[in-house]
Design a protein with these regions (language model features):
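Extracellular/periplasmic helix-loop-helix junction of adjacent transmembrane segments
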Residues: 51-79, 119, 319-323
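Central cavity-lining transmembrane alpha-helices of secondary-active solute carriers
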Residues: 71-85, 135-139, 326-338
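Helix-breaking motifs and short loop linkers at transmembrane-helix boundaries and internal kinks
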Residues: 60, 92, 113-119, 181, ...
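12-transmembrane solute porter fold
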Residues: 29-50, 248-252, 259, 272-442, ...
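Helix-loop-helix hairpins in multi-pass membrane proteins, especially solute transporters
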Residues: 89-91, 95-221
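Transmembrane-helix exit segments and adjacent C-terminal regions of multi-pass membrane proteins
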Residues: 2-30, 265, 460-521
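Hydrophobic transmembrane-helix bundles of small-molecule transporters
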Residues: 178-292, 298, 316, 474
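Membrane-interface helix termini in secondary transporters
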Residues: 54, 85-86, 90, 175, ...
């Protein structure tokens, strides 16, 4: 029986085509809550990149511990986000979402009060687990409470906010670090607390409660296998990002891939699987996730390594480096609503083709200008171009993913896309980081000494003037190689968008087709 979630936390039957859409007056609160929760999650995922030097100084963390502080959050988020999304489908999106917000807020306090590198790593791991309950629920709630004819615009605002807050993380971090003293890095985490409390109150008071999928059990075995598989893959990539491409990393990666294969086979045998295999029969769904992997792999590398390049190769301040993301942020914000409306009327194919091409041009421009180009005349315009590309890409990407899945699978669909996004971030740090490191080493002149133990983005102690100049130039060469690779990935994403996405909505105002009936890949 179709259900409609309504104000006052009541669920009433409905015969509408958009069975779960709540009254128009209540939808804005769903969207506000989803955006706020996503904001703290995505800021937390990117802000630490700028704060890492201050954290290392404050806690005495070595380089390996700093990598775990950065990647531990993403590792657990990637491992648990698919089960977290499916859990919302089973138990009710609002309740699981609220638990995730509460846990995320509590672990933010833990991070801010950590007294050792090990304590902060543990807190970041716990925060990743909390985020796995919160992040997929934000998008699933929008899909559940908005009719399909209006979802493109709503998801456009949500996805733009996600991109904006990811990009705004370094800006926020730079401002906090510039304004505070040695312990200012703690406020990078503690700023989440009041936002988390306010969001939790909004969810409990104004977001409609949904009943979940009644009469069906939870696929705990499938969830455990998925978590183990994604966790092993994420762990392997994390070791690679630390320069530890050893037998342990290889074994973990192979074991994770084997478990992913076993997970697919296991889910095919279940009558009510956590991750319905038929979702991937949709060309739109599978293509959107492949596009996510390619585009966000390039974007993740740029966003993670650009601050390092500007600080270490150019000697720019943290506050100025944070400001480099402002053009991207403003342009994405201005494009969210019109692009979402365009997708509602005309489908996602054109934005998901043109957007990645524009992003590729921006990546190429950054590759050529970030190491030595003018900050105001080259780097900021390139970031504005990147904002245009991502502003065209982000809203239709999320709309395509959620439109290809039935409402009762919204959490699982969101979980899959978020898992792909997190894995792409880990691949960016690990894979593109290895590429940048190789280019960095190759760019160091043979007659320069003192840089044997100084890796890409690291500072050397007591370097000669020649060695310091060589280090800075080599960092620029490393980022240039990374940017060229990111541009190539974005062009591949554009090709995927053209080949897999619909050029027009199936039927204006109508439900999207079930995956089983969608055109197969």
């Amino acid at each position: 029986m179709d259900q409609t979630a309504c104000a006052g936390n009541v669920v009433r039957p409905s015969g509408k085509a958009d069975g779960h859409a709540c009254p128009e007056a209540d939808r804005k609160w769903v969207l506000v809550a989803a955006i706020l929760a996503s904001a703290v999650a995505f800021i937390d995922g990117s802000v630490v990149a700028v704060a890492i030097p201050a954290i290392r100084a404050g806690l005495g963390a070595d380089f390996g511990q700093a990598q775990w502080i950065m990647n531990g959050y993403v590792l657990l988020l990637a491992a648990l986000i698919l089960p977290g999304g499916a859990l919302g489908d089973r138990l009710g999106q609002r309740d699981v979402f609220a638990v995730g917000i509460l846990a995320f807020t509590a672990t933010s306090v833990w991070c801010g009060l950590a007294q050792s590198p090990e304590g902060l790593i543990a807190a970041r791991l716990a925060k990743g687990a909390a985020g796995a309950l919160m992040v997929p629920g934000s998008l699933a709630l929008i899909a559940r409470n908005y009719p399909k004819a209006e979802r493109g615009r709503a998801i456009g605002l949500w996805s733009a906010a996600a991109g904006l807050t990811t990009a705004a993380g370094p800006l926020v971090g730079g401002a906090v670090l510039a304004a505070g003293g040695e312990a200012a890095w703690r406020w990078v985490f503690l700023l989440n607390v009041p936002v988390g409390i306010a969001t939790l109150g909004l969810v409990m008071l104004r977001v409609p409660r949904d009943p979940g999928r009644e009469g069906q059990g939870i696929d705990w075995q499938g969830g455990a296998v998925a978590a183990a598989a994604l966790g092993l893959v994420a762990y392997a990539l994390t070791r690679w990002s630390q320069g530890q491409g050893d037998a342990v990393a290889v074994a973990a990666g192979l074991a994770g891939l084997a478990l992913l294969g076993g997970f697919v086979l296991y889910e095919r045998q279940r009558d009510d699987p956590m991750m319905p295999p038929e979702l991937f029969a949709s060309r739109v769904f599978s293509g959107a996730n492949l596009l996510t992997l390619l585009l966000y792999l390039g974007l993740g590398g740029i966003l993670f390594y650009l601050p390092t390049t500007l600080i270490e190769a150019r000697g720019l301040s943290e506050a100025l480096v944070g400001a480099v993301f402002v053009p991207m942020t403003l342009i994405m914000a201005s494009m969210a609503r019109p692009v979402g409306g365009f997708v509602d009327r005309h489908g996602p194919r054109w934005p998901l083709t043109i957007g990645p091409v524009v992003a590729a041009a921006a990546f190429l421009a950054l590759a050529l200008t970030a190491p030595s180009g003018g900050f105001w005349t080259a780097i900021l315009p390139a970031m504005a171009l990147l904002g245009l590309g991502m502003g065209l890409s982000a809203p239709p990407l999320s709309t395509a993913v959620m439109g290809a899945a039935p409402d009762e699978r919204a959490g699982a669909a969101s979980g899959v896309n978020n898992a792909v996004s997190r894995v792409s971030q880990l691949l960016a740090v690990a894979g593109l980081g290895v590429l940048a490191g190789l280019a960095y080493r190759a760019a160091i002149p043979a007659d320069v000494s003192g840089l044997d133990g100084v890796g890409f983005g690291e500072r050397g102690e007591g370097l000669s003037e020649a060695a310091e100049a060589a280090r800075r130039a080599a960092i620029g060469a490393g980022f240039r190689a990374l940017g060229l690779a990111a541009a190539g990935l974005a062009l591949l994403a554009a090709l995927v968008g053209w080949l897999t996405q619909e050029g027009a909505p199936t039927r204006e105002g109508a439900d999207a087709p079930d995956p089983a009936n969608a055109r197969s890949a």
